[in-house]
């Protein structure tokens, strides 16, 4: 890529133009924008104004620590200049500007992470107005423009011009036009059918709708005509100079002629008699009007603000095309003063938990002056979906990021913001329909909060909602669960897994369901982390039904029966443990099974099968942790099941019976699968099952006409020992 820059003493006659190709994804995006019909093209202006606002934020932030940065232009503003003759709508800001490298990288050669994501969203039917959320808002100019010119001046570089008609390439050259001082001028050359965006009324309408809460003055420059009375001589002179004057006016748009209309009227009254000598002529002038005079919404009294105003502010703040779901507007006074306006969006952003993403979306102001928009210390990461503004009276204006990390004031603000967010969620929870929408989008954040925020864990746990064995298609809170607990029930029972159906049909919940004990279904991977920290709720312990030592409410008679069963099957447990050796830590009689013959449970402090699955899926997992945290497996057998009873009888008749060993291994492997674990050697297990199928179909292993492949399978299997006359179904290795 050519990167030749001209030295300042080089003659400027031969202007050097460099051509660059757009990065493939950006070229694709532009082609999509240009060749697809979108009805709401007006959002291009919102995006360009929003970019100007960001550029102004940057220079203002830099000037807090180095005031000389503003020597190239003290005023921070945005100007909109429509030109009907040239069909251009120029957006000028006095922001930070771009260096040549910025221009090449930001506008064409380096794709943002959102470029591809936005194209995918568009093709899936998303609204074009989402473009700003993906960081590629500039390209929306091509919704209305056939060509876009960008002229920019950064304090550290010369003035450059970028230009593209979107044909897969763009040009960059040193700009020899009118010096800018500092900032950026974006000039969309509008298509013939898009001239409505040059109309004063239309521009005002768009700015009011999308950008009225931008923190810098947006001024519209419009060329207008007015009548002026002059004497005949003056009129002739005026006509002679008309062309010259038009030229001058175009050049000096920021220096408008100010006409004292009042004095005209007085003159008219005084010189009524001289009217015959006067002549009316049309005079052109540039009218300037500030379009966003509204004072910051967060400084107003919440009682005076309508929901529509909050909605408009939210949209201008976030570039979201939908309304917010909930809002919290409050001020804190006393030793510390600040105001905050917080919004919950309707949807989680596409990159909510991406590491590269900025950690929050709260803009920090100090006494109405914008300081920064991703101050990590302002709100914890689990609340990174909250959008809004915080305006402090106490922080110094020239505060740096380093100082913010140490700031006690900020710690107090953060604590208050978290408290108010939780209040907002609790209020939202009273409206079931809206809370359902909120929970679908942000349940992971609540659970992450339980994992990370020990101080607010209790409050956050009240916001959790889960499906249970008794709740049907509705999610319920832990509080609801507690109100339905049986009289003699001491614990809250839960099971973790992949899907609702999987956990509902699990062997682990059989006895609990039979006894009418409600079980909570935790089916998101983050639930495993959440429940590690959430040990109890309202004094009741949370107990996993997949771990050892499950205590169920029992009367004395049931306890006595259970003890008898333990004694009766003690010998079988010992034989099974000897057969399985190190595969399991112990074999015990179960109190949780009803219809399944056996299941694998894990030790109290180890991982569950579900957690082991999650950890195995981590690309950067630590294998040493896997070693000691991986589930210590316990095999539990169901003493009331016919398979286990028959196995006990066979084992007692002959403990060296080979078929007992085969069946124990098959039972263990099947229990592993049904309990949510994966097999270390699935092929051997599959071969055992195929052998069983053949026996069930009456296929003779010794038959020479048997299929070659089955012979191959048989060769791999160790020969069965024991009496050939025993049932062939039992001879399974």
Swiss-Prot record:
Region entry Interaction with FLCN and FNIP1, spans: 285-733
Annotated stretches, region: Disordered: 225-279, 701-733
Required for homodimerization: annotated span: 683-733
Source domain of life: Eukaryota
Region (Essential for interaction with SGTA and TTC1): 730-733
Listed Acidic residues bias regions: 230-246, 256-269
Predominant location category: nucleus
Residues bearing the modification N6-acetyllysine: 58, 84, 444, 459, 490, 586
Molecular function, one GO term: ATP hydrolysis activity
Motif extent (TPR repeat-binding): 724-733
Post-translational modifications: ISGylated.
InterPro entries to which the protein is assigned, alphabetical: HATPase_C_sf, Heat_shock_protein_90_CS, HSP90_C, Hsp90_fam, Hsp90_N, Ribosomal_Su5_D2-typ_SF
HAMAP family: HSP90 (MF_00505)
Family: Belongs to the heat shock protein 90 family.
Domain notes: The TPR repeat-binding motif mediates interaction with TPR repeat-containing proteins like the co-chaperone STUB1.
Protein name according to UniProt: Heat shock protein HSP 90-alpha
Organism: Pan troglodytes (Chimpanzee)
Gene this protein is translated from: HSP90AA1
